[in-house]
């Protein structure tokens, strides 16, 4: 028997899928939105952009913008009780609408 591979996008068939009305590229407002350090953001993976997408375990996580790296943002988030630092491009981020 051959061992089954577990790639980077393993078990993401339903998670990284767009609804029929969302197909194609996202609007420019999502790409051009400027985040400042201290802003809270939601990591929302856009399956259109595969190369620079964060891992699926961070889908839906809320983080805080620490700074920028090129055109990407450095995000601090928690995975369980561990602090994680992610470098995420704007197409995979949206502003957090929650209270505090």
UniProtKB/Swiss-Prot annotation:
Keywords: Ribonucleoprotein, Ribosomal protein. Pfam families: Ribosomal_L21e (PF01157). One of its GO terms (cellular component) is ribosome. GO terms for molecular function: structural constituent of ribosome. InterPro entries: Ribosomal_eL21 (IPR001147), Ribosomal_eL21_arc (IPR022856), Ribosomal_eL21_sf (IPR036948), Translation_prot_SH3-like_sf (IPR008991). Disulfide bonds: none annotated. SUPFAM superfamilies: Translation proteins SH3-like domain (SSF50104). GO terms for biological process: translation. Residues 1-21 are annotated as: Disordered. HAMAP family: Ribosomal_eL21. Belongs to the eukaryotic ribosomal protein eL21 family. This is Large ribosomal subunit protein eL21. It comes from Pyrobaculum islandicum (strain DSM 4184 / JCM 9189 / GEO3). The gene is rpl21e.
